[in-house]
A protein has these predicted regions:
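Cysteine-centered motifs
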Residues: 579-581, 593, 605, 622
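Eukaryote-specific, cytoplasm-facing alpha-helical/coiled-coil scaffolding segments in long proteins
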Residues: 148-149, 384, 433-442, 519-532
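N-terminal "cap/leader" segments of large eukaryotic alpha-helical scaffolds
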Residues: 1-129, 133, 170, 184, ...
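Alpha-helical repeat/alpha-solenoid scaffolds of the HEAT/ARM/MIF4G superfamily
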Residues: 46-47, 53-57, 63-107, 155-247, ...
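Blade-loop segments of beta-propeller domains
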Residues: 143-159
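Short glycine-rich, low-complexity segments
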Residues: 597-598, 611
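Alpha-helical solenoid repeats of the armadillo/HEAT superfamily
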Residues: 110-123, 154-177, 190, 196-227, ...
Length: 623
């Protein structure tokens, strides 16, 4: 239907209605007129009525014709129609390419073919409604032709292709037909779609709205493919995407939706991917992340979208710090100083900075960061956060439990990694102001112990119901229950008990006596602490040894050493033999100092037994 024809239609309204005096005059003339003239008046009136009827019929015909055209447009999409559409697309693409080669300096010669090509690309969007037919795009080489058009000289054409690919790879559409989606994604990956998309990104001007939308849709394609096939993230990063994301993040441009999307895609690429983390470190990505986050050390994000970008950058930084080489880069880039400053400024970024410090210090790889943190007076920052959780945490989505979890984990890492004078400075903090920090530690201990007892009671009830129904509680179910216990507070409680064992073993009588006194006042037992540390030692590990997941890591040896303090001397021999059997002979080095055993076991023995075992040859164990 011609819409312009319908809009421009104006019915014949006839003559204007006469005024009252004109109407009287007209009636007098009709009375005075003869029969012939009266007949003429009737013929004129009939003519007007017939013209109105003709206009109505014409309008109805236009509407009927429009309905027929809509019925033709709503023909069902089938395999033959898709093949016909792909054939038309290939013809127009070839024709445009031929004319561009023939008349490179005369755009008028190929402009019409370019418009036709753009039209057929728009028509191909209908294929996204039928993912079962995606195999036709691959079999008829339409995917390769589309990828070739990503480098078209006219960015309008390349953007049209990006829009089409974004709709074809929509994650909801892909899940409608797993078979069709697999075929399409395989073809895109084989055609190095990410490399071609990055080349197209390099030439787009985001000051133009259409091209800015093209950038956004390009990132959407990557996100869709990464969600459907996570293993392609490594190839995507190596094909230039990671470098472009870092370049886009540090570009001096006002904050917009594309910068937010870049931070989100970056976090996706780094998730559970050590190769991408290493590549980011080699591209000086740690410095880029720190530079972008430094904006928020004294200023809060102005919008919710900007806050989301900040959280994405923090998540990316935490993910990178899982790699030991990136911790060195973080240390050299003065990341500790920036995080420490954020903790002092009390802005929204504080809770995320705490999480970054936790990732930077954990494990033996965090030793250098732990020592540097003490050197920059970080203890003055972390202990006020330990003594009292900050107010208004809920506004930034961080719970009190998450805050206490990160603080306790940082303190546990400091106690595990610090040596010499810096360790002494840390322990002295627990004796200040009449051991108030020990009191706070015991307060948290009983808080999470109560929470764990509630969770354990609920889990035991569920186990009882499962047994009654005849269900088998296998290892997978036990692991699920253990994860639930960790989430309920066991993870924090394990760190708290580890801190208790460390400070009680530090040969500081004031601390040992205070811990023992509070335990007696609350009617608690050291057996509970023993059980928690034992469970911690049995489950801890770095998870990087698929051949022997039960073997203890360097961190778990440290925990095992603490666990020995709680077992009693008569059981240390058996536990040591277990540790030595579980760990490579040339790496085992246990230093056991049961001096703290007097408080933890309840005995008053003052004798300090120091056992050092250096295993480089067959074991000789003498206690």
């Amino acid at each position: 239907m011609d819409v312009g024809e319908l809009l421009s239609y104006q019915p014949n309204r006839g003559t204007k209605r006469p005024r009252d005096d004109e109407e009287e005059e007209l009636k007098m003339r009709r009375r005075q007129a003869g029969p012939r003239e009266r007949g003429r008046y009737r013929e004129e009136e009939l003519t007007v009525v017939e013209e109105v009827d003709d206009d109505k019929k014409r309008l109805l015909q236009i509407i009927d014709r429009d309905g027929e055209e809509e019925e033709e447009e709503e023909e069902p999409l089938d395999e033959s129609s898709v093949k016909k559409m792909i054939l038309t697309f290939e013809k127009r693409s070839y024709k445009n390419q031929e004319l561009r080669i023939k008349f490179p300096d005369n755009p008028e010669k190929f402009m019409e073919s370019e418009l036709d090509l753009n039209d057929i690309i728009q028509e191909m969007h209908v294929v996204a409604t039928m993912p079962d037919l995606y195999h036709l795009l691959v079999e008829l080489n339409a995917v390769q032709s589309l990828l070739g058009l990503l480098g078209h000289d006219n960015t309008d054409v390349s953007i049209a292709v990006v829009d089409l690919l974004q709709e074809l790879t929509d994650i909801d559409t892909l899940h409608e037909s797993e078979e069709g989606a697999e075929v399409l994604i395989d073809a895109l990956v084989d055609g190095q779609v990410v490399a071609l998309l990055v080349q197209n990104l390099e030439r787009l001007d985001e000051s133009v709205k259409e091209e800015a939308d093209g950038v956004h849709n390009t990132l959407a394609i990557v996100e869709n493919m990464a969600e459907f096939r996570p293993e392609m993230c490594t190839e995507a990063a190596q094909q230039g995407l990671l470098q472009w994301l870092l370049k886009r993040l540090k570009a001096k441009m006002p904050f917009d939706a594309n910068k937010l999307y870049c931070s989100e895609v970056l976090a996706i690429l780094l998730q559970d991917n050590d190769e991408n983390r290493e590549l980011l470190g080699e591209l000086d990505g740690i410095d880029v992340l720190l530079q972008q986050l430094s904006v928020f050390k004294r200023h809060n994000p102005s919008t919710a979208e900007e806050q989301e970008m900040m959280e994405n950058l923090f998540d990316s930084l935490c993910s990178c710090l899982m790699l030991s080489s990136n911790r060195e880069r973080f240390l050299k880039g003065e990341g500790l100083q920036l995080m420490n400053l954020m903790l002092r400024e009390k802005k929204i970024s504080r809770s995320s900075a705490l999480k970054v410090l936790d990732h930077a210090m954990i494990g033996p790889e965090g030793t250098d960061n732990c020592h540097k943190f003490v050197d920059i007076l970080g203890l003055r920052t972390i202990f006020p956060l330990f003594m009292k959780s900050p107010r208004k945490i809920k506004k930034v989505g961080t719970t009190e439990k998450e805050h206490e979890e990160h603080v306790c984990s940082i303190l546990a890492s400091l106690l595990r990694n610090l040596r010499g004078q810096q360790r002494t400075r840390l322990l002295n903090k627990f004796t200040e102001n009449d051991s108030e920090k020990v009191d706070r530690l015991m307060e948290l201990h009983f808080k999470y112990l109560d929470a764990m007892q509630v969770a354990d009671k609920k889990i035991e009830g569920e186990k009882h119901d499962m047994v009654r129904r005849g269900e088998i509680i296998d290892n997978d179910i036990e692991d699920e229950f253990y994860l639930r216990r960790l989430d309920a507070g066991l993870f924090v409680l394990q760190h708290i008990c580890y801190i208790m064992a460390e400070i009680c073993n530090a040969n500081v009588p004031q601390i040992r006596q205070r811990v023992h006194q509070i335990l007696n006042m609350r009617g608690s037992s050291i057996k509970i602490v023993r059980h928690i540390i034992k469970e911690y030692a049995e489950n801890i590990g770095d998870g990087r040894s698929p051949e022997a997941p039960s073997k203890l890591s360097g961190t778990s040896l440290r925990v095992s050493w603490t666990f020995c303090l709680c077992l009693g001397l008569q059981r240390i021999r058996r536990w040591l033999l277990f540790c030595l059997c579980q760990y490579p002979w040339n790496l085992v080095r246990l230093i056991l100092c049961p001096a703290g055993l007097s408080v933890l076991s309840g005995s008053l023995c003052d004798q300090v037994i120091l056992v050092r075992i250096l295993v480089t040859s067959p074991v000789i164990l003498c206690l």
